[in-house]
Amino acid sequence: SRGCDRVPVPRPALRRSGAGSVGSEVVSHQPQGRLRPTLWAISDLHTGHTGNKPVAEELHPSTPDDWLIVAGDVAERTDEIRWALDLLRKRFAKVIWVPGNHELWTTGKDPVQVFGRSRYDYLVNMCDEMGVVTPEHPFPVWTEEGGPATIVPMFLLYDYTFLPAGAGTKSEGLAVAKENGVVATDEYLLSSEPYATKDAWCHDRLVHTRKRLDDLDWMMPTVLVNHFPMVREPCDVMFYPEFSLWCGTTATKDWHTRYNAVCSVYGHLHIPRTTWYDGVRFEEVSVGYPREWRRRKPYRWLRQVLPDPQYAPGYLNDFGGHFVITPEMRAQSEQF
């Protein structure tokens, strides 16, 4: 099998953002004159991979009052996760973290051998010590330009309901994926204990999170933050569509409208792009692996969430991506 923990390059022809083709310049979203506090986001730093730790070291705020969302997959080892979040917390006025699947892996090289929910609890306590906001903390409110907005960090996992074509159930979906050589590394390294399955853990998190969301002031705008996409559509551009099984849950398909979101921030897919669903902006903010970002050369590491970046015409590529689509990438996409 491909051991498909991650997808490679998107198929750009599948979806257009309406933004036109991209130019070669990096466009600043800050106005001329005094810089304003900004809510930034990034995900999938994967600092354990050679070449990615310098990326984390390059991240700096534009003002002393900037906040940073870190939307999961910082690293696999607990010491690497601590190093990165501590570095960022010392630079940004507030850091908001949600776990990805990689933080929940327990590998033989990890100095902390805890599994499943106990591992998540360990990471939450670690963040608490550093002053990093997690899904278990009170939701912070952004009151600078673009606000007020409640920032809602979530840990939801997935329940195998993003089914590939030809599958009607989880078991059928896993069989289709296996036939095509696609098996997520999560199946070997991500423990769900004490839950019987990952989908059971997901369903428990959904109930917990919905209750907190239902208690919010429905008039207050929100920024929904989850490692996995809240809707299925972003998965449509993956080279290996079967990987969608490990990418989210259909239970959240209307949360961006139900809970008054002005933006939904996610990562996981390693396809940094901006799209709109039901008029709501979705920002995939991942860095990805060195072999990916070195090839496509993203415009910038940090993504502006608030104030609304108001992307200039031509800034996004022809499917909403934050990188130039090279002829080689187009040629590869035509093979799928």
Q: Model regions: which residues?
A:
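Active-site-proximal loop/helix segment associated with metal-binding centers of metalloenzymes
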Residues: 150-223, 230-239, 334
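Active-site neighborhood of phospho(di)ester-bond hydrolases with catalytic His/Asp-centered motifs
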Residues: 41-43, 68-73, 96-101, 133-138, ...
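N-terminal active-site segment of His-dependent metallophosphoesterases
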Residues: 24-97, 103-109, 195
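Rieske [2Fe-2S] iron-sulfur-binding domain
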Residues: 1-23
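Binuclear metal-dependent phosphoesterase catalytic core
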Residues: 36, 130, 236, 242-260, ...
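Short coil/turn segments at beta-strand junctions that form active-site/ligand-binding loops
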Residues: 66, 93, 147-148, 219-221
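Beta-strand-turn-beta hairpins that frame and shape the catalytic cleft
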Residues: 31-40, 139-153, 276-281
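Metal-dependent catalytic neighborhoods of phosphoester/phosphodiester hydrolases
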Residues: 51-55, 74-89, 102-129, 143-146, ...
